[in-house]
């Protein structure tokens, strides 16, 4: 901590209304559109090679991406482009914001008040993404992947408009 650190402007916290979500539910990360996964221009996601996958599109500007379920933040990439949640029932989820956005090296992403290993509730803010800035160089489809469904046979709902906290599995 430097001598003048206390004078530096701190980033303001992002507070969103708390959600009441059951431990076995998977929900939308933010307000947007759940789109057909086959339209994502990356075969790893479009062909669901990592597990059952859905994709979201968000409006221009900044979007706060939240935890899709109750559990533990199992992984949080320092670049902000991806994070994973291990649900309380053992189901493992991965959120990947944009295609090839690892190449942005964190530009356009801001980590929010959570760190790897933290307990999270569905709807807790994890990352802020500047969709307008990032979409200049990347497809900004945001994928939600069930990398391990713990034998539950989970399926995503059909494409539709969604709001943060809306259940997205059948």
Say what each PLM segment does.
Residues 2-170:
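Contiguous, well-folded functional domains in the mature portion of proteins
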